[in-house]
Regions:
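A short, conserved structural fragment
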Residues: 361-370
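Short active-site neighborhood of thiol/selenol oxidoreductases, capturing the structured segment around
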Residues: 18-22
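Minor-groove-contacting beta-hairpin "wing" of winged helix-turn-helix DNA-binding domains
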Residues: 371-376
Length: 392
């Protein structure tokens, strides 16, 4: 058993994760299409903590006894939660399933000075990994992205997080309007210099229904075209690899052993319970993989939980074919690729050797020994098309 704050051995077992969704934000970022909500009155954290406890108990009834491999508090902005609320939620997870000492417990946080003041409380509650939504390291782009912090606050939060938590990750968004390769290289080098052991690096995308979608459609700003974005992606791989943070997934980079155990559960097609407004879960129930989808509106979700013990309003039981397709889509995002025998167990058949031969000839996929298959760097860029071809 590992000690508090240490990383678990990163074997390839898919795992069983618990995801908690805190849906509230201080402000809605213009690029964000996540289930997040702004409230101008204080949130009743006591009510939501009790609702999390109740829904976790209901999920335990559905999953049966399990050993948890990771816990992730996402959002929204979980760093708006009081440390006491976080402690209640983590205690509730431990009451319902086996939680070994030292498993990864991540909390997403914004780097504003107000939220950083809560870091020691989160650590005392049991959080051992923080993921900071830095997004940019210059004030002009932070304002463009609608962030409430500035660069000085971000650097202060990074330093404080390094001091308090055993593990730290932070996010950056690139392929921003007017961003040159030289500017991105300098910013990325600066980020790596702050000694995070994990970086999540996302290209700016325009999501339907967001303010950025309307502004982009009105030609108020432009993002890099596909060729320029591909060049920035290639530059990202080059710089991170040179500094010992290779991509272990399309957008995620880590020093060996510092990969996100929770996110690996998703990509390795493990099981996870989703609790909270808008949360999704995928776990095996009565021998079949079941999808759960919770009510998105926070207050409506809480009403449902208080009435019947959960806020799940949608879901399905996946067919074997759907499981196989999801396994491909998630697993080929990883540098380690997929276990071909596991795909066959899901689908009842192997991948088409003819299609594999064509994709290998095009340099889009490559075998790892006789047992695994991975997407190449070129294949990662067009992964949706590669998966669609393999799944036919």
């Amino acid at each position: 058993m590992t000690g508090p704050g240490m990383t678990m051995p990163l074997d390839r077992s898919p795992g069983f994760g618990v995801y908690i969704h805190w849906p509230f934000c201080a402000a809605k970022c213009p690029y964000c299409d996540f289930n997040s909500h702004v409230r101008h009155q204080p949130v009743d954290q006591e009510r939501f903590a009790a609702a999390f406890e109740a829904e976790l108990a209901t999920m335990r009834e559905r999953t049966g006894p399990r050993e948890v491999t990771s816990i992730f508090l996402g959002g929204g902005t979980p760093s708006l939660m009081k440390p006491e609320t976080v402690a209640r939620v983590l205690d509730a997870v431990a009451k319902n399933w086996t939680v070994p000492d030292g498993i990864e417990v991540t909390l997403e946080a914004n780097p504003s000075s107000v939220e950083a003041e809560r870091f020691r409380g989160y650590r005392a509650a049991g959080v051992n990994r923080v993921s900071l939504g830095v997004q940019a390291l210059n004030d002009k782009d932070l304002r463009f992205l609608g962030r409430l912090h500035n660069v000085d606050e971000a650097l202060h939060a990074i330093g404080l997080a390094r001091e308090i938590f055993p593990r730290l990750s932070f996010d950056l968004i690139y392929a921003r309007p007017g961003q040159t390769p030289e500017a991105w290289a300098a910013e990325l080098e600066q980020a790596i210099g702050h000694a995070a052991d994990h970086l999540s690096l996302y290209q700016l995308t325009i999501e339907e229904g967001t303010p950025f979608h309307a502004l982009h459609a009105a030609k108020k700003f432009a993002i890099p075209d596909n060729d320029h974005a591909a060049d920035l992606y290639a530059l990202t791989q080059e710089i991170t690899s040179a500094h010992g943070l290779p991509a272990y997934e399309i957008s995620n980079h880590a020093r060996p052993g510092a990969e996100s155990r929770h996110n690996l559960t998703y990509w390795r097609y493990g099981e996870y319970v989703g609790v909270g407004p808008g949360a999704h879960g995928r776990f095996v129930e009565n021998g079949r993989r079941t999808v759960t989808i919770a009510e998105r509106m926070p207050e409506t979700w809480a009403n449902l939980v208080e009435a019947k013990g959960h806020g799940v309003t949608g879901g399905e039981i996946l067919t074997r074919s759907e499981e196989a397709d999801e396994f491909l889509l998630m697993g080929l995002r990883l540098a380690e690729g997929i276990d071909l025998s596991r795909y066959e167990a899901f689908s009842g058949r192997g991948l088409s050797s003819a299609r594999l031969s064509v994709l290998q000839g095009e340099g889009l996929v490559a075998p790892i020994g006789n047992a695994r298959l991975r997407a190449t760097p070129a294949g990662m860029i067009v992964l949706d098309a590669v998966v669609a071809d393999l799944a036919r």
